[in-house]
From Swiss-Prot:
Main location, first listed in the record: cytoplasm
Domain CSD2: 482-556
Annotated DIS3L2 C-terminal domain residues: 983-1033
Assembly description: Interacts with serine/threonine phosphatase ppe1, protein kinase C and an osmosensing MAP kinase.
Lineage start: Eukaryota, Fungi, Dikarya, Ascomycota, Taphrinomycotina
Family: Belongs to the RNR ribonuclease family.
GO molecular function: 3'-5'-RNA exonuclease activity; RNA binding
GO annotation, biological process: mRNA catabolic process; nuclear-transcribed mRNA catabolic process
GO cellular component: cell division site; cytoplasm; cytosol; P-body
Gene3D superfamilies: 2.40.50.690, 2.40.50.700, Nucleic acid-binding proteins
Descriptive protein name: Protein sts5
Modified-residue entries (Phosphothreonine), positions: T157, T262, T377
Residue numbers bearing the Phosphoserine modification: S264
Annotated spans, Disordered: 18-40, 154-178, 247-286, 454-480
Length: 1066
């Protein structure tokens, strides 16, 4: 296999397929270094006497990146039904297997289009002004879709003899051959295909649609496909949900709770529902086999299936939800059987079911569970009365109380978790019929146990009651497996072979109760309730903060492994090219005479920089300093100000599509935690690209012509070379803000830009740091400041200039690239959440303007009370979906749903441009600007790669933000002292069964459940947001927003650590 694809971006599935010569893109000649030190050795795990030598972690993750992890997607037909591949050979080990149909996704290379058209910009820069031309960047030629399913390829579906809930197609279907099939797009509907277009023969189909040879090595795809033809069109949804039986495949009758097949879309199976497993002992299928991968595109085209990313509820792990583009509500997945072995974050194919039958089954199951729990007899959370009549305090079951303690205790904020009550029937329901994509190399942290948690609890109860049970299994019987309990409760228990456990584990398992291990899933057959996996390594004791941080990085999927292979070689080549061509200022504007300054997080001395340069031979040097992406210069003019924002030019040395570029796309973002940072770039290359004091630097520069009132009258973008004269640390700049002439001018211009943008002049102290939508992941994160509600004045001013630069670049991209522009957008909060936010504001004595994001920020900034402002921005932050990248062309009609609260003018367009050393999204924007400066067109293939990068980078930004907040929570736990047991807080949200408390000193929020308090009755007045608490003495305590409370907190060692409420005083 070609080296370029052998080390390709791992969120793709590449089979034994050679690159088409026409696909080759121009790239510099890479000269491999002969220095053996450039090759990073595998991370070795030191063996010890009491545990075996496991596969080294980095080697294991490298192998996972090149082997399959989709659960039981390999299949064969045995005894009349489709059997899991678990009998015999596990996932990722397909030796000596026959060529059989497969569910594994594959990717085919796209043919690049022939580019045409003349360059729009013959020079190396372009300018805009108020009267700028509206000439648009012409759309790149579109490749006609050649990926259609031959009608002779029949869908493997049979009428199931089992009863099944009524399933729904998404549009009326007259017959299975009524539409031509097209490949699927993750979490999107596939649009109708032109029936007049010819269909290719079977041998011309991409491997995505063909049976796959299991002898071939392959890699799983990610949550999206980089070169997949499935991005040929991102569909709008023209059809409607059909609520009647329209398919001749659909079985008669319902019975959602009793089916053992995929219903109307079942694969061929016998009526027995048992698998021999290759051993002669039949085992019952606990899950439905996945549909053949080759049948998925046709079913999507016929509106028989929908696709999306699976999200498992943290509050109730039996529930899951799939967000589908084109549907006005999420699809509800009820229970583990309907989830069908899919994991959090998987791209899944969903068949819609009858909502009434699914919901009735869920309510019946909840009622049965409630009857078994005597604690729940005093009250129910599902039928709370919210009028002015006192009602009995609802009691949580022991299981729910424990789940609440774990979910609410490990987060900094109480994020809006999906949880359905008895009166919240979903609009759509469905079940998983195939896992289409899964992030490769997933490794989970957790603990080991001999018994499953449920079995251990039963044994403990038997022991406490004096019943030791049967002793037949005690003594010489050695268990074949031990159980791995993941830290993330959404991940199922994993069965691990006993041989992989520490040698003394069976005889001394309690000694390992507080030890953190790493494990991965190898396979999950349909006959097993739990997946089978393997131990990867041991992190250490749970009370070690370094082990906690390592567990956090693994559980969130942060790529912290060293650079190796062709990506590391490509990084060295880029570093050498940067050194050899420095300084080639041809075509660059020279701003070395300008008074350029920059800001750094830490005090980066010249000695530290020199130390880094001594390690340039090692691409993974640990002597890293803070990378600086942006610098500024400001000069007064006769009518205003000349402002320059200079951003390091990464596109100068990174070739799109190179191994370095693909590895940067895989990592997507630098992760900044309180305890450590995981950079996006290799240390030496990042240091070479970083802007430094008294160093000549290549930049992509943006010049702003700013009026005296803060209005931007014109912009210029082009390549430049600068030499910063001064580097301020953030602490130093705060101290000199009013005395340093350079910083005073910086303060004046930034303040006027902010005043003009918001339409009002507000103090810097009222800056709403938490709800800024352009930098949610906080690349400027300060590990010493854990309160996210506090910002320094210099940081606010700096971000104002960067925000102006991002909006100016977004305006250029929108004008030139139109629907191909790489922009940052945000979904609307739900109407109900907007109503609650406005109601909260009114109860606290203010009114918010929710007509647009800008107007909301303006309203929040006008609130003088810090506490009220922080509570409102906290709630808005929790209920607003995270901002994402998008290219409108590949989003269909989703774009209209993805804008912010509203757009007041074109300047509200946003993108990421100013931090290319921290975010891959900024690198894509630099690529697009490079095309504009060169007057070139982007190929359709390259645009699809960028659309894929938008999906991946958006997901990674959310992960980075969650990791940041969790690291703050871990730091608060590690610094905990007995004096912090009682904390002063303010009520920030009120509900019938709980109220939330905000702690201003910690910047943290916790929940107080009413069943923790000694109460007899409660009364909730929803219209006024008042909760009245009645205790046994008859006293009444009124709780509403801004009520001062004193809360007793307690900490508990877990992964992540827990901080919860034990008592409250009013």
């Amino acid at each position: 296999m070609d080296e370029e694809f052998e080390n390709d971006f791992p969120y793709k599935v590449m089979l034994n397929q050679q690159q088409d010569p026409s696909d080759a893109q121009s790239s510099p000649t890479f000269v491999p270094s002969a220095n053996p030190s450039l090759t990073t050795p595998w991370l070795q795990t030191t063996p010890s006497a009491n545990r075996p030598t496991w596969l080294p972690l980095q080697q294991h993750m490298h192998q996972l990146r090149h082997t399959g992890l989709l659960p039981a997607v390999e299949s064969s037909f045995v005894h009349g039904h489709r059997r899991s591949a678990s009998a015999g050979v596990g996932m990722g080990n397909f030796s000596n297997q026959a060529t059989i149909p497969s569910n594994s996704p594959a990717v085919s290379n796209m043919q690049p289009p022939t580019q045409g058209g003349q360059p729009l910009y013959p020079t190396n820069f372009f300018t805009t002004s108020v009267s700028a031309s509206s000439d648009s960047f012409p759309n790149s030629p579109t490749v006609p879709s050649k990926f259609s399913l031959n009608p002779s390829v029949a869908t493997s579906t049979n009428i199931s003899p089992r009863r099944h809930a009524k399933s729904h197609s998404v549009a009326s279907v007259s017959s299975p051959n009524s539409h031509n099939a097209v490949p699927f797009t993750p979490h999107a509907f596939v649009p109708p295909v032109n029936n007049a277009s010819p269909l290719p023969a079977l041998n011309t189909l991409p491997q995505l649609l063909r049976p796959r040879n299991l002898d071939a090595q392959w890699r799983p795809s990610s949550l999206s496909q980089t070169n997949s033809p499935t991005h040929a069109a991102n569909p709008s949804f023209p059809g409607t949900i059909v609520t009647h039986n329209t398919s001749n495949f659909r079985p008669e009758g319902g019975g959602h709770r009793h089916r053992r097949s995929t219903g109307s879309l079942s694969v061929g199976s016998s009526g027995s529902g048992f698998s021999s497993g290759g051993s002669g002992n039949p085992r019952k299928n606990l899950f439905s086999p996945y549909l053949p991968q080759s049948s998925i595109p046709a079913l999507l085209a016929e509106r028989r299936l929908v696709t999306g990313i699976l999200i498992v509820s943290k509050k109730n792990r039996s529930d899951a939800f799939v967000s589908v583009d084109g549907l006005d509500a999420e699809v509800f997945i009820c229970g583990s059987k309907d989830r069908n072995r899919a994991l959090e974050g998987d791209v899944v194919a969903i068949e819609l079911l009858d909502v009434d039958e699914v919901w009735a089954g869920k309510l019946e199951k909840e009622e049965n569970r409630r009857r078994k729990d005597p604690i729940s007899t005093r009250g129910s959370f599902d039928n709370l009365r919210i009028d002015a009549v006192p009602f009995e305090v609802p009691q949580r079951s022991a299981i729910k109380a424990r789940d609440d303690e774990q979910v609410e205790g490990q987060t900094l904020f109480l994020l809006d978790q999906k949880q359905l009550g008895a009166d919240e029937k979903p609009k759509y329901a469905g079940h998983v019929v195939a896992v289409l994509q899964r992030a490769p190399g997933q490794v989970f942290s957790g603990t080991l146990g001999i018994l499953r948690p449920s079995s251990a609890a039963n044994k403990e109860r038997q022991t406490s009651s004096g019943n030791q049970g049967s002793s037949n299994n005690s003594g010489n019987d050695k268990p074949k497996i031990v159980w791995f309990k993941p830290s993330d409760k959404r991940v199922p228990l994993i069965a691990i072979p006993t041989e992989q456990a520490p040698t003394d584990f069976l005889g001394n398992d309690q000694a390992y109760a507080q030890r953190l291990f790493l494990a991965s899933i190898k396979r999950w057959p349909v006959t097993s309730l739990h997946p089978f996996g393997m131990l990867v390594g041991e992190l250490g004791s749970m009370d070690s903060m370094s082990a906690q941080v390592s567990a956090l990085l693994h559980d969130t999927g942060v790529h912290s492994e060293p650079w190796e292979g062709s990506a590391a070689t490509s990084a060295v080549t880029a570093l050498n090219a940067l050194s050899d061509n420095f300084l080639n200022v041809a075509g660059c504007a020279d701003y070395r005479s300008e008074d350029v300054f920059l800001f750094v997080k830490n005090d980066v001395s010249k000695a530290a920089v020199s130390e880094v340069k001594q390690h340039e031979s090692n691409i993974n040097s640990s002597s890293a300093t803070d990378f600086v992406s942006s610098a500024f210069h400001i000069r007064p003019t006769s009518t205003g100000y000349h402002v320059g924002i200079h951003v390091t030019d990464v596109s100068r040395v990174i070739e799109p599509g190179s191994p370095l570029d693909r590895e940067l796309q895989r990592r997507s973002i630098a992760v900044n935690l309180c305890q450590k940072s995981v950079p996006l770039f290799p240390t030496t290359l990042g240091e070479a690209l970083s802007l430094r004091e008294d160093k000549d630097c290549y930049t992509m520069s943006l010049l702003l012509d700013v009026s005296s009132t803060g209005k931007i009258r014109g912009t210029w973008i082009g390549w430049a070379v600068i030499r910063p004269r001064k580097a301020y640390t953030m602490k130093e700049a705060d101290e000199l803000l009013q005395t340093d002439a350079r910083l005073r001018l910086f303060h004046t211009v930034s303040s006027r830009l902010r005043t003009h943008h918001l339409g009002t002049d507000v103090p810097l102290s009222r800056y709403c740091r938490l709800v800024r939508r352009w930098d949610e992941e906080s690349c400027s994160f300060d590990p010493n400041e854990t309160n996210l509600f506090i910002s320094s004045a210099v940081e606010v001013l700096r971000e104002t200039l960067l925000d102006a630069a991002n909006r100016a670049v977004a305006s250029h991209l929108r004008q030139e690239f139109r629907e191909n522009a790489f922009l940052r957008t945000q979904r609307l909060p739900s109407r109900e959440n907007c109503r609650i936010l406005q109601s909260m504001a009114i109860q606290m004595g203010c009114v918010l303007d929710l007509s647009s994001t800008k107007s909301l920020l303006r309203s929040l900034s006008l609130i003088e009370d810090d506490t009220v402002r922080n509570i409102l921005q906290l709630y808005y932050y929790k209920v607003t979906p995270r901002a994402v990248y998008e290219m409108q062309k590949y989003k269909g009609n989703l774009a209209s749903q993805m804008m912010s609260l509203g757009i007041e003018d074109e300047s509200d367009d946003l993108t990421h441009f100013t931090a290319p050393l921290e975010r891959y999204g900024d690198i894509v924007v630099h690529y697009q600007l490079q095309l504009l400066l060169r007057g070139e067109l982007a190929s359709e293939k390259r645009l699809r790669v960028w659309s894929q990068a938008a999906n991946d980078a958006s997901r990674r930004l959310v992960i980075s933000k969650f990791a940041q907040e969790t690291s703050i929570h871990i730091k608060i736990f590690s610094d905990w002292a007995e004096s912090q047991v009682w904390q002063d807080g303010l009520v920030c949200f009120v509900a019938p069964s709980y109220f939330d408390v905000f702690f201003p000193s910690l910047g943290m929020e916790k929940r107080v459940h009413l069943d923790l308090l000694n109460l007899t009755h409660v009364r909730f007045e929803e219209d006024q947001g008042i909760l009245s608490l009645y205790d046994e003495s008859g006293a009444v305590t009124v709780v509403k927003l801004l009520t001062s409370v004193k809360v007793k907190l307690f900490v508990q060692l877990s992964t992540p650590p827990l901080i919860n409420v034990s008592n409250v005083e009013f």
